[in-house]
């Protein structure tokens, strides 16, 4: 192989290695093993065995702080089962704030078509009848044929359960009770697994709901220092399946050597005192990968200096780093949130989703983009979820009784957003002007 061919091959291998590792920092990535919660995984496996293998209707509750990996933990455990053996319905207390939507998703999984125009009460009643609830007519006519349903067990994941029940109103408690009640029909296997960052949420349930959660909740434990180191090593190491065995072994040997460096270990200990969640280390991984350069002999492979430089970068203003990491669309939505507040004469610091989406966001689309090609509402809500997870916005502690998306507001200094817009080179000029000129 000529020197040119070898150089091109090495460049290709480095690019491929970068892509593999960068993908591991995405929210959709699931590791082959879940470090630090092995005991908790066995408990969830037992629940899922009942739900999927034994086709029993069951409930489970996974608790842990925001960003602790509750949803990833569930998805990791679910990987054990063949996807053709169950149906999964995912609901979110943040996104699916419309009760009818939740019911229709569940009915769809059960193979039940809901007639249009039914209110919540009649929708529940319609589903119950379809599931085999005895009516006066069926009691009289015992020859009534039972409807055949989807034989696959249905697992319903409700993420951020506390947002569904935040208002603690009777209607919301009744909604959840009625959902759980659907699992008691003999001719269907319907199980509920909920995640929440509110560890004492069971104490907030009415007695009739609390009685359903007889087993102790699964608590995601904080990661130990050793677990964090193992996870980080796994994140930046190349897999056995990597194309070039020699390149993989050299890469992994450099990773092993670097992580044993005294200075790297000390930096890990300092950072661990502040952060013990995996997503806090994704920024470090991305910074390390960004600094690798085939043509720079000092940065050709991962080494202790590159890792320590990454820690130094993280020691900058954390807010500044987070704002740099936002996508252009996320930053645009953030600017719209700020301008929604500026453009209204309301005393309440919190704004509604409609004020943002149908107000400032649509106004921006018309004024700068000359069209109404906005992101869809579910996509916008997911962006708000991400901003909430990062702590850039916060929601009111209580949702309103109608089940609308909770009001929210900026939780950081607006000046930091303006400064970030000025310093980011990837933002369109119109967005920079929108944020820096409209807000000042």
UniProtKB/Swiss-Prot annotation:
Protein residues bound to ATP: 64-71
GO molecular function list: ATP binding; ATP hydrolysis activity; DNA replication origin binding; nucleotide binding
Protein keywords: ATP-binding, DNA replication, DNA-binding, Nucleotide-binding, Nucleus
One GO CC annotation: nuclear origin of replication recognition complex
GO BP term, pick one: DNA replication initiation
Subcellular location as annotated: Nucleus
Superkingdom per UniProt: Eukaryota
Predominant localisation class: nucleus
Family of this protein: Belongs to the ORC4 family.
Function in brief: Component of the origin recognition complex (ORC) that binds origins of replication. DNA-binding is ATP-dependent, however specific DNA sequences that define origins of replication have not been identified so far. ORC is required to assemble the pre-replication complex necessary to initiate DNA replication.
Subunit structure: ORC is composed of six subunits.
Protein name: Origin recognition complex subunit 4
Organism: Dictyostelium discoideum (Social amoeba)
């Amino acid at each position: 192989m000529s020197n040119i061919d070898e150089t091109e091959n090495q460049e290709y291998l480095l690019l491929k290695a970068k892509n593999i590792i960068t993908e591991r920092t995405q929210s959709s990535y699931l590791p082959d093993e879940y470090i630090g919660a092995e005991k908790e995984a066995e408990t969830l496996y037992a629940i899922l065995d009942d739900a999927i293998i034994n086709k029993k209707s069951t409930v489970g509750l996974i608790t842990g702080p925001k960003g602790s990996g509750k949803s990833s933990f569930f998805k990791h455990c679910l990987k054990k089962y063949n996807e053709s053996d169950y149906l999964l319905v995912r609901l979110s207390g943040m996104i699916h704030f419309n009760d009818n939507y939740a019911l229709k998703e569940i009915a769809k999984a059960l193979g039940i078509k809901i007639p249009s125009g039914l209110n919540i009460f009649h929708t529940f009643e319609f589903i119950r009848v379809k599931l085999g609830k005895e009516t006066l007519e069926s009691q009289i006519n015992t020859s009534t044929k039972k409807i055949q349903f989807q034989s696959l067990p249905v697992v319903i994941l409700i993420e951020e359960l506390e947002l569904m029940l935040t208002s603690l109103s009777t209607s919301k408690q009744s909604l959840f009770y009625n959902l759980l009640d659907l699992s008691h029909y003999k001719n269907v296997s319907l199980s509920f697994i909920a995640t929440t960052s509110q560890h004492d949420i069971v104490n907030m349930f009415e007695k009739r709901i609390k009685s359903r959660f007889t087993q102790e909740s699964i608590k995601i434990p904080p990661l130990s220092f050793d677990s964090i180191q193992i996870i980080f090593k796994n994140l930046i190491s190349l897999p056995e399946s990597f194309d070039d065995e020699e390149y993989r072994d050299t890469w992994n040997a450099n990773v092993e050597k670097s992580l044993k460096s005294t200075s790297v270990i000390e930096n890990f200990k300092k950072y661990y005192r502040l952060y013990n969640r995996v997503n806090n280390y994704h920024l470090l991984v991305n910074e390390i990968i960004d600094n690798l350069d085939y043509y720079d002999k000092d940065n050709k492979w991962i080494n202790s200096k590159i890792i320590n430089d990454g820690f130094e970068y993280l020691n900058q203003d954390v807010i500044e780093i987070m704002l740099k990491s936002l996508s252009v669309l996320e930053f645009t939505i953030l600017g719209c949130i700020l301008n929604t507040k500026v453009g209204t004469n309301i005393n309440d610091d919190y704004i509604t989703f409609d004020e943002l989406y149908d107000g400032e966001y649509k106004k921006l689309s018309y004024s700068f983009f000359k069209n109404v090609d906005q992101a869809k509402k579910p996509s916008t809500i997911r962006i708000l979820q991400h901003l909430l997870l990062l702590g850039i916005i916060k929601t009111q502690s209580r949702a309103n009784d109608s089940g609308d998306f909770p009001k929210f507001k900026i939780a950081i200094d607006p000046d930091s957003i303006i400064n970030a817009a000025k310093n980011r080179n990837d933002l369109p000029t119109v967005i920079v002007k929108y944020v820096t000129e409209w807000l000042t």
